[in-house]
A protein has these predicted regions:
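Alpha-helical transmembrane segments of multi-pass small-molecule/ion transporters
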Residues: 1-300
């Protein structure tokens, strides 16, 4: 787990340092974001999905991730309308508030806090819960709040042509056919390994640890939902439905993870207040290193 944290902080810090003390080429962050969304993220999905197995008894892991996303959408849209936030701000906040870092931060945290068995359950929540929300819900939010009015047909087209969604469909088919040959699996893994360092470096290029004037309220709302309110609601759902044990604990811990890196990248690509989205992401990652272990201590 320590090595994963060091990588996260090093890549983020390197981006901050380059932005402050070097002269990065114009458009560097956008170029890195293109690679992350078009190449690295689909490669990750293509590598993981074929080996994923789902049991209906694990529904809680999936539904809680969907609930985090739609709950964030409802909350941010309602508050944003009354606070007169711009459409870009609302859309960017929905993305980073509704989608969690359930893989690159979630996997090492779960393995450290709950062992290998906890990690296996966490993969289900990540791939079938949070990732599907990125591939479908995230694209819908980006289309709706990204500027010009988009027809339902155009929204559907964007979802179906989103590279990671295509990778999800292909991955399911490949899984039914027995998986990838070893050489292709290794190649996909190598491409996927570029996602975390490049994405965090890109975020670091625009990262501001201290929110700018006017950002305090949106940042506080976003992280209150992501790190506190969403896990509490997931706990309430578990108590109401009788879900317990490891499934309950892992489901709640995955709802409590920091904002998703790829969500901030998506916000950047669609001009959904990138400075705010990156601030929520960076501050959320740092705070979650404290709040997630506290949640783990509180859960059975």
């Amino acid at each position: 787990m320590l090595s994963a944290f060091v990588l996260l902080l090093a890549c983020l810090g390197l981006g901050v340092g380059v932005a402050r003390y070097a002269r990065p080429p114009i458009g560097l962050a956008q170029a890195l974001n293109w690679w992350v969304i078009q190449i690295a993220l689909p490669a990750l999905v293509l590598g993981i999905v074929p080996s994923l197995h789902f049991d209906t008894a694990l529904w809680f892991l999936v539904v809680t991730q969907w609930g985090v996303f739609f709950g964030a959408w409802a909350l941010i849209a309602w508050v944003g309308a009354r606070a007169h936030w711009s459409r870009g701000t609302i859309g960017g906040l929905i993305l980073v508030t509704g989608l969690g870092n359930t893989s690159f931060l979630g996997y090492p945290l779960l393995e450290a806090l709950r062992g290998r068995a906890g990690l296996q359950l966490g993969v289900v929540a990540d791939q079938l819960g949070c990732f599907i929300m990125l591939a479908v819900g995230g694209v819908l939010v980006a289309a709706r709040y990204g500027g010009a009015t988009v027809t339902p047909t155009e929204m559907l087209r964007r979802v179906l042509l989103f590279p990671a969604f295509i990778a999800l469909v292909v991955g399911v088919i490949v899984g039914q056919l027995g998986g990838w040959p070893d050489m292709l699996a290794t190649m996909l893994d190598r491409f996927a390994l570029t996602l975390v360092p490049l994405a965090l470096f890109s975020v670091g290029l625009r990262f501001k640890l201290k929110p700018q004037p006017g950002q305090w309220a949106p940042v506080a709302l976003a992280l209150s939902w992501k790190l506190l309110l969403a896990p509490l609601l997931a706990l309430g759902l578990a108590l109401l439905t009788g879900v317990g044990g490891a499934v309950m604990s892992i489901g709640i811990l995955q709802t409590a993870m920091a904002p998703m890196i790829s969500a901030a990248i998506l916000a950047d690509q669609h001009y959904l207040d990138p400075p705010l989205a990156n601030t929520v992401l960076g501050v959320g990652i740092l705070l979650s290193l404290i709040t997630v272990p506290l949640w783990s201590l509180a859960l059975p």
